[in-house]
Amino acid sequence: MKENQIKLGEKVIVSDPCYSDVDGWFNNQINNMRPGMYDTQVVKSDEGDWGDRIASLTVLHEIIKSPIWEDIGSVAVDSGQMSICCMTSYRNDEVAKDLPWLTEKGDPFGDHPIRPTKETGEGWYVKMCDRTLREEQWGTYESGVVSSTGYGDGMYKLEVSKMDDMVHGIRVTFLQSEEEREDELLEEGYYD
C-alpha cells in the first residue's frame, strides 16, 4: 500500500467521526463504491491570519486519472472533522486498538474533563482526533481517512465521481475561492 492510500469496500460512510448514528441525516452512506485501493488527498488553503486550512478532502480510485464530479448534496460537521471510510471500520474500537498514536502526546484528551463519553466508538473517535489535531491536520488508516474541516463546523458540499453506476471518487469541499463560489451561484441561477 502506498503512503496516503486506503482500501475501501463497497459500503462507505462520509461523516463527521463524532456521529455515532450511522443512519442520521447528517452523514452519507454510499453503497455502490468500487472496491479497491484509493488515493487520498487534501488541498490546503492559506487563510491569512487563520493559517493553512484544509479546503477539500478527496478519495479517488487508483485507476482513475480524470474524474468528473457530480454534486450529490452536503454533509454536516459538528466536531470540525470529516471522515471517509468503510462502514466496517467506522467507529470500530477494535480497528482503533491497533492504530498508532500520531501526535507526540498520544491521546489528545487524556483525563481532560471534555473527554468524549465512554461509549462504543469512542476509542476510534479519539484516534481520529489524534490525526486531525497534529500539524498536518489529517491522516489515514488502512480503510479510512479523516481531516479537519476548513473553519470547523457547518454543512459542506459532497461530490462523487461515477463510472458504470459505481462510485470511484468522493470529494468534500470545505473552502472555496471567491471565484469558485461566484461560478457556483451563477450555475444555480442567482445571477442574471
Where are these regions (language model features)?
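Intrinsically disordered, low-complexity acidic regions enriched in Pro/Ser/Thr
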Residues: 1-192
